[in-house]
Amino acid sequence: MNKGKVDVLLGLQWGDEGKGKVVDVLTPKYDVVARFQGGPNAGHTLEFEGQKYVLRSIPSGIFQGGKVNIIGNGVVLAPDLFMDEAKALEASGHDLHARLHISKKAHLIMPTHRVLDAAYEAQKGKDKVGTTGKGIGPTYTDKVSRNGLRVGDILDHFEEKYAKAKARHDAILKSLNFDYDITEVEKKWLEGVEYLRQFPIVDSEHEINNILKSGKSVLCEGAQGTMLDVDFGSYPFVTSSNTICAGACTGLGIGPNKIGEVYGIMKAYCTRVGAGPFPTELFDETGKTIRDLGHEYGAVTGRERRCGWIDLVALRYSIMVNGVTQLIMMKSDVLDGFDTIKACVAYKQNGVEIDYFPYSIEEGIEPVYEELPGWKTDMTKFTSEDQFPEAFKNYISFLEKQLETPIKIISIGPDRDQTIVRK
């Protein structure tokens, strides 16, 4: 942790790496927690005082009393879903109103954005990207084409701005011959807009830079993972924002020289939700076993996650584009019972072995594996790295050598206490 710096925490795979738990472990050390991109399509699952929460838009530092949490300009916000999420937290005793600040420049997901999402996916037929249907893509499209509604717009002449944006969407949907009725959804959405007005709506870029100037520390969290980044992920099967470290600069309004540590989170294996290429995917009983042991189902959608062995080619690429300084390995305990662990160290692309992540991994990619002995030990009760079995220590050393980055934190179970910080 660096005073006067922003430390960035992000996923290195296809999302669902376990960022929620890690943020919960790290936040006590920081003064402020900020979210820099994404929307309610991805959820962080956290356990706090025996209760499970899924946070979609609200930063995970909200459980730490007295800390300011900021929703940055790079986030897209659905007022109705935000209201549900915030009210559920308030009902469980967490006072948000003074501590949760929302950027004026964050874009609003409108009800018609969700309809557009469904209409565009229906048009694609068998080429569907597999969106969550939450309207994320169309909202970012409006942002880039300079047609978006922002949180700051709810403070002045909102009805007029909303009617204009909605009319534009209606015209597009009419041209697509897509039938819809948003009467009930819109009613709740407008309630959400009113609810949003109760929170501090701020110039977050000024706020964060002033916080840094005063010598305080900021932990910045992203949603999803590097391999879903719109520029560097497995395009077109990606999200609509920059999930990488550089997205923290554009999504919060901070300079690159303000970035301190970059924590990269990975699972001890690999998962992916929805459509898209996945070189190490397992279609056999092993894949099913990993899914069952790891409870690999989407926090928001409930969708089954596709499971496979760890992909070191993709991880090396993720570490490179993010400038990762420390690795955090999640769900090591899921592999506790395996005789043999596999790790993909290279790809064969159309028969030629390569050790880098290529332009496309959609076709002709075959994983090249190294096999390592499993540790066959229940590690969930361990409290120190000194207790790790030799085979697991060897697995860690192997990964660190392959990835050329230290693994500083290892998770051996879902609870906050089941976290080993290495010396």
For each predicted feature, which ranges?
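Non-transmembrane, aqueous-exposed alpha-helical and coiled segments at domain scale
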Residues: 1-423
